Amino acid sequence: MAETQTVNPMRKLRLEKVTVNIGVGEAGERLQKAYQLLQELTGVKPVYTIAKRTIREFGVRKGAPIGVKVTLRGKKAEEFLNKVLAAVGHRIKASSFDEYGNVSFGIAEHVLIPGTRYDPEIGIFGMDVAITLVRPGFRVARRRRKKAHIPKRHRTVSKEEAMEFLKQNFNVTIVEG
């Protein structure tokens, strides 16, 4: 009698969020164009990122807006992630994964994303994409009421598990480098 091995549903990984960041490095017209571009690409209103400290060499003051970012969750995150992965050819370097299951990679030009056209008024921007993976039940440690401790074996997502998740769900090829 062959027994089928069941997988614990609480051990399955899921996509928590996709964070998209465009760092401009200065306030002004380019920052407004990056804001407009990110809003068009994602359909979500971006937030401004501000400088943590003054860097005189770059002309950046503490508290000045220097970039825009968007956090996507749920279906929007999956749809945008599929588009962005198509822009990089469904290939991610192994060095893009950290030991907690997060993945980060960059896109040199937003025009590489399928369905995006070049607009001379906006110009060309690069962007950083960060993917966060979690297990179900992770909210227990973050919620406001009745917080509880989550064991380390459930809390951490290994690099190998994250790679396998992206291979299975998004047809990603992991490249050494």
Curated annotation (Swiss-Prot):
It comes from the Archaea. One of its GO terms (molecular function) is structural constituent of ribosome. Part of the 50S ribosomal subunit; contacts the 5S rRNA and probably tRNA. Forms a bridge to the 30S subunit in the 70S ribosome. This is one of the proteins that bind and probably mediate the attachment of the 5S RNA into the large ribosomal subunit, where it forms part of the central protuberance. In the 70S ribosome it contacts protein S13 of the 30S subunit (bridge B1b), connecting the 2 subunits; this bridge is implicated in subunit movement. May contact the P site tRNA; the 5S rRNA and some of its associated proteins might help stabilize positioning of ribosome-bound tRNAs. Belongs to the universal ribosomal protein uL5 family. One of its GO terms (biological process) is translation. Pfam families: Ribosomal_L5, Ribosomal_L5_C. This is Large ribosomal subunit protein uL5. Keywords: Ribonucleoprotein, Ribosomal protein, RNA-binding, rRNA-binding, tRNA-binding. It comes from Sulfurisphaera tokodaii (strain DSM 16993 / JCM 10545 / NBRC 100140 / 7). GO terms for cellular component: ribonucleoprotein complex; ribosome. HAMAP family: Ribosomal_uL5_A. The gene is rpl5. InterPro entries: Ribosomal_uL5, Ribosomal_uL5_arc, Ribosomal_uL5_C, Ribosomal_uL5_CS, Ribosomal_uL5_dom_sf, Ribosomal_uL5_N.
